[in-house]
Amino acid sequence: NTGNFMYSTLNLPLIAHQAVEEHVPFYTLLDHYCNIVYDTLKFRRSEVEKVLYEYHMSDFLLQKDKDTGKPLYDLDRCTYTIGFCGLNEALIVLEDADDDYDGESIVKRLNMNKEMFNRRDGLRWSVIASPAESTAHRFALINRKKYPNSPVQGTKKNCYLTNSSHIPVSNPSTIV
């Protein structure tokens, strides 16, 4: 198979802040942002299709396997991925929400969106806990700019979100 095409990472604490601030259920916003990821990755795919099939800028990707005759690179065999970062900090923010949330149900909700996308277009959608330290730092800066008391890890100068789905042992929140 071809592998992962692209992924977009959701800033879970920022979504949580928005939910608390606007008194909107967190899952309503999470679903909304998952749909934005869907639309974004579908748009990116359409642009790559143009590069491959209309502009022929990467013809080497269209070479055929000598045994099967199928293209070595096939956009239909790629995985399209919803990434997430800051589950720990999102749970801290959501302690002030009107509803109760836990980490497991948030990840299950992301998975539910993924399954819906799989059925919608037949492509291979997945969910990953984004492993990008630079994203964890950038998201923390964004969150602190908009919400000065937003929970982060590290120091004021070198802040970051807890990577992916990790929750520190010292956190009183529970993943389940």
Description of each model-found segment:
Residues 12, 89-94:
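Short, hydrophobic beta-strand segments
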Residues 5, 74-91:
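Conserved phosphate/anionic-ligand binding catalytic regions in large, soluble enzymes, centered on
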Residues 1-76, 97-100, 104-176:
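Conserved catalytic cores of very large enzyme subunits
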